[in-house]
Amino acid sequence: MKQQANLIRAGQVIEHDGRRWTVLKQQIITPGKGGAFIQVEMRDLKTGNKTNERWRTADTVERLLTEEKEYTYSYMDGDNIVLMDPETFEQTLLPLDLLGDQAPFLQDNMVLVVNLVEGDPVGVTLPAQVTLEIIEADPVVKGQTASSSYKPAKLSNGVKTMVPPFIEAGERIVVRTEDASYVERAKG
């Protein structure tokens, strides 16, 4: 399906130069002189290579339609993750690199959304937030109360994040899977 280049968004799958690409980032740039253009960072679905491409905003690109299907995460198998189809109970093997930076947030029995193009997996979406335990938290530095200060902490999955000063080691917090940022204390 053809669409204007200025409508490209992260997560979409497009066809360019006879290859399939998943869009990682996009930015519309309007220079002081000349027409606006869109800068797109994308990854080749076959090779995994990244590239940057520029189009004028009026150009058209071929967008591929993706189908979303829910799977349940089972376990890791080397550089792959094993997912189970909750309807048929069939197991599917996907490369871990489809998750990118979100891989450490995988939890047993987590429901993932797999994006498929013509039956081939092209991306995996995790839930927006997960609950994890703080295993290490720096002590509060006295006198840093004038502004909203955060301190470094290490989560149970090994990821480091910044948390408010009242959070201590052993507490459970909710973090965003997108950027590992603190959301709130876990309830219950």
Swiss-Prot record:
Coiled coil regions in record: none
InterPro entries tied to this protein: Elong-fact-P_C, NA-bd_OB-fold, Rib_uL2_dom2, Transl_elong_fac_P/YeiP, Transl_elong_KOW-like, Transl_elong_P/YeiP_cen, Transl_elong_P/YeiP_CS, Transl_elongation_fac_P
CDD domains, per the entry: S1_EF-P_repeat_1 (cd04470), S1_EF-P_repeat_2 (cd05794)
Signal peptide: none
PROSITE patterns registered for this protein in UniProt: EFP (PS01275)
Entry annotated with the keyword Cytoplasm: yes
Example GO molecular function: translation elongation factor activity
Cited Pfam families: EFP (PF01132), EFP_N (PF08207), Elong-fact-P_C (PF09285)
Any single biological process term in GO: peptide biosynthetic process
Keywords tagged on the record: Cytoplasm, Elongation factor, Protein biosynthesis
SMART domains with a match to the protein in the record: EFP, Elong-fact-P_C
Cellular localisation: Cytoplasm
Pathway in which the depicted protein is active: Protein biosynthesis; polypeptide chain elongation
Cellular-component GO terms for this entry: cytoplasm
Entry similarity comment: Belongs to the elongation factor P family.
Function: Involved in peptide bond synthesis. Stimulates efficient translation and peptide-bond synthesis on native or reconstituted 70S ribosomes in vitro. Probably functions indirectly by altering the affinity of the ribosome for aminoacyl-tRNA, thus increasing their reactivity as acceptors for peptidyl transferase.
Official protein name in the record: Elongation factor P
